[in-house]
Amino acid sequence: MSPLDDVVSPSQWMLWRLTGAALVVTLITSVIIVAADLYRHWQKRRSVGQIPLIHDGSWLSPKLQWRRPSFDAESEMARAYKKYSKNGKPFAWKTQNGLDIVIILPPECGKEYYSLPREKCSFMHWVRNEMFLNTVVDVTWRVPVEAVQVSSQSAPMDRLGRVIFDHLDRVLPLFLPGPGDHEWRQVNGSDMMDSLVRDLALGLFFTPGFGEESGLRRQMSAYMDGLAGQWFARQEAPYILEHLVWRLSPTCRRFQSTIQTVRQIVVPEVRRRIQQIRSNDKDGCFLLSDLLIKQALKRGTFCREGKTGEQETLEELIVDEIMFMYMETVAPFHLVTTCMVFRIMRHPEYVAPLREELDRALKICGGEWSFEIFNHTPKMESFTREILRLHNPTSISGARCVMEPITIPSLGMALERGTHISLPSRFIHTDPENYPDPMTFNGYRFYDEASGTCNVQKTLAPSEAWLPFGIGTSACPARLLGTRTCQALFAKILMDYDVGQMDDKHVPLQMWLLGIYVPSPTISISARRRDARRTHEALGSKLKPEE
């Protein structure tokens, strides 16, 4: 008999044994989790060989880090561009989710991969991997891309343009002073533009008033926020627990619930539109959601990669794509148009010339707001292009996931399946060899004063020195529609409102957030409704709110 038997009861002894076993299991599990994380990162580091790696020094997922290392990612990326890219050498960068590494190729190497077929180098597979979309939506389905390409054709663009301007007349007074209200109103710039764009984007997918009673706008916004929330939750978790987090995390479960709620609201409407299109009653079917359905019907299939009709209904498939396309619409519109407004606050000298140009264009177009007016606004085109150059949201562009082994001949580099590659677009756009005095905003940089023109094709056509829309086979298919929509929102604000000057001329207009440049959250916008009878001289007056 053990001496402990005199002081420890059998039940206590059993409790100790269970506690000890639990501690051992916890310890072993913890070791496995940490070891899996280290092994995952070791694999990724090994895959890039001797290529210099720029990262924060940690090889663990954020949740496993005792203390976050101090790391100025933007400065390190800029330094690597000067040290490696400018000398024709690649470098590797630990991506936003901390689990993958992307090889940043020198700009001149882009032509060696960006025209390869998608079966060899895929942008959408890169997006799926980066944003954990494998359990959310199949972004590799080609139908949405083809639908957006159709939207850029002349007739759909014309109809969508009229929808956008009509919708702007309805939503602008919800966030800024309406007709007859000439008092100054101050709002947070980024927040206001984000809310405005979310309302505007709904008009590209649904007819006015649809879903108001069921709270569609609120649910679509919850989808956007939830998509970001699930990304943060999964990228911070240890690699081996990522799928468990998706199934059990409250954030992820709320997001999944939001998807189901949106489906319940939108599926009946999608079903109605499918029947309408199949019955050849197509006159009222021209929104992006309609083009998506039409393209799927044209292809004769509603099945995505790895999916069958038994796994998901036709309507749910369409709704999932609408939700994701909505997010893809809102994010760039918000990031770009906010900076456009910030720039006229900092540079009011552009206000009068741009208004005069818009006024002339409106007269040419019979006084009717449509995308056609931007064919007569070269200064506006140059201003927009300078925004895209200096304030493009992305730090890298032209990203691809290698689907089949390829070679970059100029570097003598073989890339294996699963490798991520990209180009350093932000630093290409701010390289003085590409653009003189690159950090100075010049709204007329691309305006040819001699001919009075600015070619929109140069805005939309990617090159090794111009990458706001990606490049090659995976360049953004919505670049024309997106550019025109941003210009429409900016033009309506410019013509309908006075906007106060920015007092602090040195406050950064953007901030770096995990590889994305977002509008500064601290800048406020002061706006006042303009009097339509204001004289031409008043257009050039100093636009600053009264104290």
Curated annotation (Swiss-Prot):
<dbReference type="GO" id="GO:0004497">
    <property type="term" value="F:monooxygenase activity"/>
</dbReference>
<dbReference type="Pfam" id="PF00067">
    <property type="entry name" value="p450"/>
</dbReference>
<keyword id="KW-0349">Heme</keyword>
<dbReference type="GO" id="GO:0016020">
    <property type="term" value="C:membrane"/>
</dbReference>
<keyword id="KW-0472">Membrane</keyword>
<keyword id="KW-0479">Metal-binding</keyword>
<comment type="pathway">
    <text>Alkaloid biosynthesis.</text>
</comment>
<keyword id="KW-0017">Alkaloid metabolism</keyword>
<keyword id="KW-0812">Transmembrane</keyword>
<dbReference type="InterPro" id="IPR002403">
    <property type="entry name" value="Cyt_P450_E_grp-IV"/>
</dbReference>
<keyword id="KW-0503">Monooxygenase</keyword>
<dbReference type="GO" id="GO:0016705">
    <property type="term" value="F:oxidoreductase activity, acting on paired donors, with incorporation or reduction of molecular oxygen"/>
</dbReference>
<feature type="region of interest" description="Disordered">
    <location>
        <begin position="528"/>
        <end position="547"/>
    </location>
</feature>
<dbReference type="GO" id="GO:0009820">
    <property type="term" value="P:alkaloid metabolic process"/>
</dbReference>
<feature type="transmembrane region" description="Helical">
    <location>
        <begin position="18"/>
        <end position="38"/>
    </location>
</feature>
<dbReference type="InterPro" id="IPR036396">
    <property type="entry name" value="Cyt_P450_sf"/>
</dbReference>
<protein>
    <recommendedName>
        <fullName>Cytochrome P450 monooxygenase cpsD</fullName>
        <ecNumber>1.-.-.-</ecNumber>
    </recommendedName>
</protein>
<dbReference type="GO" id="GO:0019748">
    <property type="term" value="P:secondary metabolic process"/>
</dbReference>
<feature type="binding site" description="axial binding residue">
    <location>
        <position position="476"/>
    </location>
    <ligand>
        <name>heme</name>
    </ligand>
</feature>
<keyword id="KW-0560">Oxidoreductase</keyword>
<keyword id="KW-1133">Transmembrane helix</keyword>
<dbReference type="GO" id="GO:0005506">
    <property type="term" value="F:iron ion binding"/>
</dbReference>
<dbReference type="InterPro" id="IPR001128">
    <property type="entry name" value="Cyt_P450"/>
</dbReference>
<comment type="function">
    <text>Cytochrome P450 monooxygenase; part of the gene cluster that mediates the biosynthesis of campesine G, a dimeric indole piperazine alkaloid that shows good insecticidal activity Galleria mellonella. Within the pathway, cpsD acts as a dimerase that simultaneously catalyzes one C-C bond (C3-C3') and two C-N bonds (C2-N16' and C2'-N16) coupling reactions between campesines B and C to produce a heterodimer with unexpected 6/5/6/6/6/6/5/6 eight-ring scaffold called campesine D.</text>
</comment>
<feature type="compositionally biased region" description="Basic and acidic residues">
    <location>
        <begin position="534"/>
        <end position="547"/>
    </location>
</feature>
<dbReference type="GO" id="GO:0020037">
    <property type="term" value="F:heme binding"/>
</dbReference>
<keyword id="KW-0408">Iron</keyword>
<comment type="similarity">
    <text>Belongs to the cytochrome P450 family.</text>
</comment>
